[in-house]
Curated annotation (Swiss-Prot):
InterPro entries: FAD/NAD-bd_sf, GIDA_C_N, MnmG, MnmG-rel, MnmG-rel_CS, MnmG_C, MnmG_C_subdom, MnmG_C_subdom_sf
Family to which this protein belongs: Belongs to the MnmG family.
Cellular component, GO annotation: cytosol
UniProt keyword annotation of tRNA processing present: yes
Transmembrane segments: none
This protein's name: tRNA uridine 5-carboxymethylaminomethyl modification enzyme MnmG
Localization in the cell: Cytoplasm
Amino acid sequence: MHFHERFDVIVVGGGHAGTEAALAAARMGSKTLLLTHNLDTLGQMSCNPAIGGIGKGHLVKEIDALGGAMAIATDYAGIQFRTLNSSKGPAVRATRAQADRALYRQKIQNILQNQANLRIFQQAVDDIVVENDHVVGVVTQMGLAFEASAVVLTAGTFLSGKIHIGLENYSGGRAGDPPSIALAHRLRELPIRVGRLKTGTPPRIDANTIDFSQMTEQKGDTPLPVMSFMGDVSHHPKQISCWITHTNEKTHDIIRGGLDRSPMYSGVIEGIGPRYCPSIEDKIHRFSDKSSHQIFIEPEGLTTNEIYPNGISTSLPFDVQLNLVRSIKGMENAEIVRPGYAIEYDYFDPRDLKNSLETKTINGLFFAGQINGTTGYEEAGAQGLLAGMNASLQVQGKEAWCPRRDEAYIGVLVDDLSTLGTKEPYRMFTSRAEYRLLLREDNADLRLTAKGRELGLVDDARWAAFSEKMESIELELQRLRSQWIHPNSPLVPVLNPHLNTPISREASFEELLRRPEMDYNKLMQIEGFGPGLADPLAAEQVQIQVKYSGYIQRQQEEINKAVRNENTGLPLNLDYKEVPGLSNEVIAKLNSHKPETIGQASRISGITPAAISILLVHLKKRGLLRKSA
């Protein structure tokens, strides 16, 4: 049975990757269908009710700069906002928001329902239809066939998902949802390498049974940050506190006593878990010298009593979970409303993807999110946007696009995955980026919004706001560079009390701002120097561009050198055995990874600069030198 309409792009899955993919393709004008097993869970936050953080907040800002939904939904759902690393340099500052699960889901669903060119249909997908190495559609569990030119698969943890609590386990995509068994079996038939990963979640606690007076209160920031470049503090709902407590030796003894019934330590779970978000049993085992671990007590929303105890993800049996929770200060009488669990699921080796997130072996089939071995809403959303965008570009007969490592954290994410692959759930950190001084949260729109407009991702309202901001920044920078103060100026007596060293020679306003004791707002409040910019984001941009101009220029020069051969393309059908001078080890690695560019090849472990030189000579001799998009 065939559906009565044909689509340009079909997106399978309605999580963070799927929603961004569907919205991106539809914004670009492609007739798009989003298929989900349950309309009510579109935009569901399956684990931690929070968005952003170190590295992750950078991805959210980039999604937003390209017109995505995650940051906007967070502004409407965020019940506590904080800027992490606020005392450090701008490169590592990151916005994090605690979110109300219900409000976040509602906002995402509202955005989806009002998006032109997008249809939503409730059915689980059981089959991917491939003809002559090209995807042509999907078939749902009731046998309904949908045709499309491109398919974006965002199956999350649902592929052959298995939930573990103690030594008991059962099939599931997440708690309360069925797994995708038939689709997982079908995908294993495709020529793409497959593995198993594991992730977990903590038990949820009834807030009415917690003694918060025994814990440390953690309030949000004042003034309140916003997540979206289009956001405003007026969008935020009521703001509330989180709380901090700790495990103790009694907690650790309870956990050690239950390890014989842990699915992780009894060999029941085969999948590898996330290194940077370990279970509490993993923490006790790996950091046996520590007598306590911090736990963040995070409300799940304004209209629920459920609490997310961030830091005690576990798959131990329920009785052990209850005992360990009640051993923690402030939770002596706590009641669990949902048990913690681990989930194992299939993922596919991202080295089998192009940097457009299209599979190398099946034309028109794109993968995004946890199916590629990542962990986290933000990583999923970034991949979804990129995959949906490239699916739309392909349908339109246009070249694929992916930002380079020096252009966006999205570029770092995709390059790491498609070049190096991953054997454990991949999480973004600022430390993964070589050029993080240029890849800041604050300039994500300056880096990406113009490209997003060119691609058709950015609407008129965002473009108008961005253009106005850019113009105000440029005009203010020109003003600071062109206005000067002389030692005999009547402004000097007003200015000198604010300076460590008094004015002794002619100086521009820009030079004054560059002084370490001066900041933009302080300078603008001094008589004769203001009023300055009213927009705090534009003002912040002016300050950073002035104060860090030397560092930024040096990093840009490094990038210009590195980019010279970065985008030199390598044919996917190139047999490296035919390249004279390469060692057997290098040949094996290049034939296994099939890098798309010289830049990707250079980042594969064991590929030497000499091997790269040999490749460049070979390409030149064969007339194969080309630049990728």
